[in-house]
């Protein structure tokens, strides 16, 4: 019996190796949560007025603030919870009606920082940076409220930190059982 394949970045296992590890013959289909995240990413990308160089579904709870000057559009999964149907007389839930998935859809941009001479950013430059972030907010907010079934929609900004700033919408969508 050979050891399991290493799953590091430089030598990820092939799809057939994943299938062998899971006991499946064919590669699995993407989960409904991931498929929803991809659809949100595609819709968000088409809604943005200011282009980004990187668009991705982020793994984990945080988004890496690397190379922010390229501009990033991301979707991350915040949480997924089952919503149950009626409760039976014995106290058991009869069925799961749907899953409530909470996502974050946001952008990561660079902002002006202190220059090599120790001078802070000019007010004009800071205002221009804010204008781009606010346009991202408006574009993505319009997409979420007009083209999705998003609820509990809220925007917040993070940063600036290390020359980067981010703004993201958090919201919930109903999805079929994963």
For every predicted segment, state its role.
Residues 13, 19, 115-129:
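A solvent-exposed, charged loop/short amphipathic helix patch at secondary-structure junctions
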Residues 88-98, 159-164:
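Short, solvent-exposed beta-strand/turn "edge" segments of beta-rich domains on protein surfaces
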Residues 22-26, 34, 121-125, 144-145:
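Sequence/structural signature of long amphipathic alpha-helices
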Residues 96-114, 165-177:
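Oligomerization/assembly interface segments of phage tail-like spikes and tubes
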